[in-house]
From Swiss-Prot:
Protein's recorded name: Nuclear speckle RNA-binding protein A
Any GO CC annotation of this UniProt entry: nuclear speck
Keyword vocabulary terms for this entry: Nucleus, RNA-binding
Predominant localisation class: nucleus
Pfam families membership: RRM_1
Ranges where the RRM domain occurs: 136-222
Annotated PROSITE patterns: RRM (PS50102)
Organism: Arabidopsis thaliana
Induction: Constitutively expressed.
SMART domains xrefs: RRM
Amino acid sequence: MADGYWNQQRQQHHPPGGPMKRPRSDFEAPSSTMTIGHGGGYYPRDEDLDVPDTRTIGSAYDRYLQSVQSGEGGSVSMGRSGGGGGGGGGNVQTIDDFMLRRGGVLPLDHGPNGHTIGFDPPEPVGRRNLPSDASNTLYVEGLPSNCSRREVAHIFRPFVGYREVRLVTKDSKHRNGDPIVLCFVDFTNPACAATALSALQGYRMDENESDSKFLRLQFSRKPGSRPGQRGRR
């Protein structure tokens, strides 16, 4: 009797199965109403995102390049023939590449194209606010006593507006001391001289010598004076 009763109970009460699955339409929202954060496996398609207008960006970049290049010598990336002639478009080199090939070292804050690292775009030389004492001649300190005028000219020749180097060597006031080198570099105008000054300030000529001095440049107070040249050529 007891066995028959329990068999009837088992037939009437089946063990509960798993949760019933709802149709997909019950829990899936239309693709147009789903947000990015809805569902862990959903990723928006490319057409769902806003695509910037590349034509607008390109035209703005073109205007930026034109504004940078509109000034005289607006960048330190300049083309100049190796023989010291006028600027040429076929032999363009940056001052960074030129100096690295010579073995020199630029300051740590020196950025590409001769500009210091910063968030502002490079300002064209013609639009730069020059100091009141700016002149077209730079006075350079920190050159080794045995350097020649040709070596100094190699450093400044890539800059637009470069004219010539005047090197004067004086005897030291101390016995057995190294000669004193006075260096003057002439440019066509103060703006070109300011570009070279900002690019080469703190430049070290020889990275292999631990005691190599850093160049210190400033505008010459007497740009018109031309002392006798006793420097090595």
